């Protein structure tokens, strides 16, 4: 069983009197920086000079420094810039300025797990990974709640790395909801696998293929859109609130029977086999290697696929339907 920590098992004491440098002030960086400051901790921001984020962080009362200087001033460093920017920034601005014994925190294990970032042995390396976008991290904190998070220790130089991870999780409000202890490998691999076979890749293709089937059978695209995309949110909300069995108890008997008998014929063992193949590509590092090479070439394949997604017929129909639902 997973080890779950709440507010009672976490303390801010390990961070008291320490300087926390948040590297990056995007959606996640801003949310975590504000929450940590509101929890009574000393927070500075590390950014490239002159950008909009610099102006925003300054206007919100933070002391802002160039990344290297922020790292030199810090006892605890949160690396909250986009994954694919991290290796270059790490090599050029973070690693040369690290002090012995500092704590470095990541929100995702990708670069460390796959060896794109190789931390020195004389620091703590931890992860606090909120399981929600930055907007929710901030809003839930302000509401007196929190979003769940994963915590992990990659390197425990001080002997207190887990205490630092739990303190950061408490500082951003995550222990109010509960944090699960994991590893860099488990967080990274399950995150990528979940995105690919269910959350982004799986759902997207299931919806698109369902739309195509209905339209090819002669049904109106607008009706098809409502049936396979718009109503998907209603079902997902039920699953989120009640679980799969609870969702089944919230739909009609006709929907129950049709779903339970036809669903396994469509998402069959062959689909499960392909899911496992995709999962093994992640676990082996094959996907990471492919993606890093793609990114370093300027992401031509990604741009092509994004254009195909943008021009899919469901997007034109969806644009009109969303105007009806939400206004122009």
Curated annotation (Swiss-Prot):
Catalytic-site annotation from UniProt: 108
Regions annotated as coiled coil: none
Binding positions (NADP(+)): 25-28, 48, 53, 83-86, 134
NCBIfam families in alphabetical order: ilvC (TIGR00465), PRK05479.1 (NF004017)
Gene giving rise to this polypeptide: ilvC
Protein name, as recorded: Ketol-acid reductoisomerase (NADP(+))
Species assigned in the record: Pyrobaculum aerophilum (strain ATCC 51768 / DSM 7523 / JCM 9630 / CIP 104966 / NBRC 100827 / IM2)
Family: Belongs to the ketol-acid reductoisomerase family.
BP GO annotations: isoleucine biosynthetic process; L-valine biosynthetic process
Domain KARI C-terminal knotted: 183-328
């Amino acid at each position: 069983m997973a080890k779950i920590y709440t507010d009672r098992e976490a303390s801010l004491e390990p961070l008291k009197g320490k300087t926390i440098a948040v590297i990056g002030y995007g959606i996640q960086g801003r949310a975590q920086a504000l929450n940590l400051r509101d929890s009574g901790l000393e927070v500075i921001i590390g950014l490239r000079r002159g950008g909009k984020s610099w102006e925003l962080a300054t206007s919100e009362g933070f002391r802002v420094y160039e990344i290297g200087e922020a790292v030199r001033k810090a006892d605890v460093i949160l690396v909250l810039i986009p994954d694919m920017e991290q290796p270059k920034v790490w090599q050029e601005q973070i690693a040369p300025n690290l002090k012995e014994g500092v704590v470095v925190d990541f929100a995702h294990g990708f670069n460390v797990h796959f060896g794109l970032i190789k931390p020195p042995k004389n620091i703590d390396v931890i992860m606090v990974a909120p399981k929600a976008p930055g907007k929710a991290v901030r809003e839930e904190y302000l509401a007196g709640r929190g979003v769940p998070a994963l915590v992990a220790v990659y390197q425990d130089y001080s002997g207190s790395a887990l205490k630092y991870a739990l303190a950061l999780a408490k500082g951003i409000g995550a222990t109010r909801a509960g944090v699960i202890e994991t590893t860099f490998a488990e967080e990274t691999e399950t995150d990528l696998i979940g995105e690919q076979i269910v959350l982004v890749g799986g759902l997207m293709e299931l919806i698109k293929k369902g739309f195509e089937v209905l339209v090819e059978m002669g049904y109106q695209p607008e009706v098809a859109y409502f049936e396979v995309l718009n109503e998907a949110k209603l079902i997902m909300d039920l699953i989120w609130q009640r679980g799969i069995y609870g969702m089944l108890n919230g739909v009609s008997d006709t929907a129950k029977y049709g779903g339970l008998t036809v669903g396994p014929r469509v998402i069959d063992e062959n689909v499960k086999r392909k899911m496992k193949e995709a999962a093994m590509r992640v676990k082996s590092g094959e996907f990471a290697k492919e993606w890093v090479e793609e990114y370093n070439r300027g992401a031509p394949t990604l741009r092509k696929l994004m254009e195909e997604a943008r021009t899919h017929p469901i997007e034109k129909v969806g644009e009109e339907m969303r105007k009806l639902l939400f206004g122009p």
